[in-house]
């Protein structure tokens, strides 16, 4: 142990290097030398460095003596460094720019890629755009800068696009897109939202996410998922309805998430969405157009408000579109702002609402007032033309254009309402001498009760002369089959229709109702075969006409009360356009006046002989 101070003194002072071998001989035991060496070597080197930097020999000697006991350490350190430097060297080689003769080294692949794009590829704005790849011997030429920058990723070890399913990285987005298609049949895709496929789900949750079997559902024409009862996130839904992405975001912020998979519905929770299938937009738009066409026909006076038949034909197409019992199109078509989206349930599809602009035929206040007045006339016409017994709601009500509404043929009796044989046939009770099959009194095609079949089936209620159904019975008298009117003795010649007669003479003298214009001379057998084509109008149709008119009037009055109309058509035009049109009109008026003013004095004075349009030959003497 006495050699240690001598070694320290020799190292610190550096006066003489000879005492170094003597301590080496006086240390026969390896244990103290090994224990003292690591302790003295750092101290010696430290003291030597602090005391005098001009003695390299002493420092080297002390270093050699200190390394005698720690021989294996240097041998181990180079091996580890060589193993770790191999991949580092390979990585450094991949981060060298091989564009032409650049050979510049970079610390990361991102910096290398930006260097190539900015310095070597360049830009068109800086007039240094290069569309040919010069990486080693590539020489690939493109037509756009985006193409060459995408191609450069092949040479650069930059793989920013990572697959969320297998963790594999790719250099270009198109490579990742092709790779993702290989996972299309894997079960790992099931239960993953589009947001998760883009990297929205972290790795911890991805590891815990359960794997489910692919559902066998399908989307119907309204965009609703049908035919499966399995939910990826373990939340069963009602009615067997599948919802892939259920409650991933709070209900207070419904549309902060992507809108291609809405998780909640509007208008409250519905227990059965299959019964709430909104009509297609095209069908509802067509119904709105029918209602608008009706108002347009009224404005163009194409509907006669005093004719019940014209009113009925015009109102018939509106029975279904209006939907009086369900609050249909009339309320939705009125001008109103679009509905705001309100979320109430996360188990059912999105409710479909449509918003259409106001009708073009009902824009101004004058249009609404005229339409209300016209509908009032139509309502009075429908009310006055009711020929139905209100107490019985009889289905035998019929209004025919050829019969006066106050005639007995159009009035229903209690017998005809309760008789099973006379259903749909009005009770006709004329005398045998008042009707015949002569011209002018032939039964019209709209009267089914005058056919032989109807006469036989309704004998108790119709007092018509019947022909014998069995041979041997006497025929009725001629007086019962002929006409008793003296002014109707003229007979028609063959081939001449009833419509050939003058309607004025017939209206002045004939007390019986006029035949319809469509009716021709026909036999009773033809009437029995054809019968009533359109069928009698029922009480429900008449009542529906009244409801439609009242419904339209209520909507118009509501718009007038809330002043939901345009003040004037000119208010919808730009004032600058109106001023320019007024100036153009004034200029045209001035030009017309200037053209007329030179001609007025000429017309007042003597007219000058007009010059002939052809050459005049000289007169020969």
UniProtKB/Swiss-Prot annotation:
Short motif YPX[LI] motif 1, span: 464-467
GO biological process assignments: positive regulation of transcription by RNA polymerase II
Composition bias type Low complexity, residue spans: 15-87, 409-423, 436-465, 583-595
SMART domains: ZnF_C2H2 (SM00355)
Biased composition (Polar residues): 1-14, 476-486, 515-525
Domain of life: Eukaryota
Start-end of Basic and acidic residues biased regions: 502-511
Major location (coarse): cytoplasm
Keywords for the protein's UniProt record, in alphabetical order: Activator, Cytoplasm, DNA-binding, Metal-binding, Nucleus, Repeat, Repressor, Transcription, Transcription regulation, Zinc, Zinc-finger
Zinc finger (C2H2-type): 95-120, 131-155, 161-183
Signal peptide (UniProt feature, chain positions): none
Subcellular location: Cytoplasm; Nucleus
Transmembrane segments: none
Chain ranges for the short sequence motif YPX[LI] motif 2 as given in the UniProt record: 614-617
Sample GO molecular function, one term: DNA binding
Region (Disordered), start-end ranges: 1-87, 395-539, 566-621
Post-translational modification, as annotated: Activated by C-terminal proteolytic cleavage by signaling protease (probably palB/RIM13) at neutral to alkaline ambient pH.
Any one GO CC term of the record: cytoplasm
Family: Belongs to the pacC/RIM101 family.
PANTHER family: PH-RESPONSE TRANSCRIPTION FACTOR PACC/RIM101 (PTHR47257), PH-RESPONSE TRANSCRIPTION FACTOR PACC_RIM101 (PTHR47257:SF1)
Chain's role: Transcription factor that mediates regulation of both acid- and alkaline-expressed genes in response to ambient pH. At alkaline ambient pH, activates transcription of alkaline-expressed genes (including pacc-1 itself) and represses transcription of acid-expressed genes.
Subunit note: Binds to DNA. Interacts with palA/prr-1, which binds to the two YPX[LI] motifs and is required for proteolytic processing.
Name by which UniProt lists this protein: pH-response transcription factor pacc-1
Organism: Neurospora crassa (strain ATCC 24698 / 74-OR23-1A / CBS 708.71 / DSM 1257 / FGSC 987)
Taxonomic lineage: Eukaryota, Fungi, Dikarya, Ascomycota, Pezizomycotina
Gene behind the chain: pacc-1
